[in-house]
Amino acid sequence: MNNINYQYDTFCKQILARPIFLAHILKQCVSEFKQFDISVIAKDCIRDIHVNQKNIHRFSPFLSQFEDDSLKEGKAVFDIFFVARLPDSDSDIDFYINIEIQDDFYPGYPLSARGVYYGGRMLSMQYEDQIRHSNYGNLKKVYSIWICLNAPKEERGSITEISLDKKVHVGYNRIRKEDYDKLSVILLYLGKESEEEILGLLQTLLDETIQSERKLAILEEEYGIVMDDETRKTTIYKVKY
């Protein structure tokens, strides 16, 4: 990636990491947040957002880590990483969430497999923070969300979720969903106009061909995005770059 593309890629991550946009993603893609207002999610549910940062302390009680090399597993670099909680939760952290912007749809391996791996890394990085002394019942659910910009034509405009499930082959058991439903990978394939709100919003936000004032107007008028001054400035700067 040359320097210009790298800087534009960084700008995309910085604007997407604004709480208002993360809140839209959570509400429309993460089932646990669907019943809550976007303004509440943006203000009260999202914390410790980091973009392309390294060497964040792994043992922080509010862990946010982009380059994880814990447990001698090698490095996994995350584009955007944050923790989230439900508005009515007594816990400081309910979810560990990673968001990736993927321009290359054919990097030489299945993106779904990489998403599962990233999810696994977010589970293992909780070892000291959540499951110390083998308290595995405190393991928090992880989401790895992939925004794919150049999907095959026939797959554009789709949203797919890969998650853990159980199959009882013989007899009956009492295993509760909340005890195994700990990892989901969500794939959003952009690339065409879509009636699905989150796809249209992301397509508009990440489309470098739309001029800044037009982009702001679409985000505000069609998607109801209420931006503070800093978010507006970041969006305009990204578009004008």
Residue ranges and their predicted role:
Residues 1-241:
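Elongated, amphipathic alpha-helical interaction scaffolds
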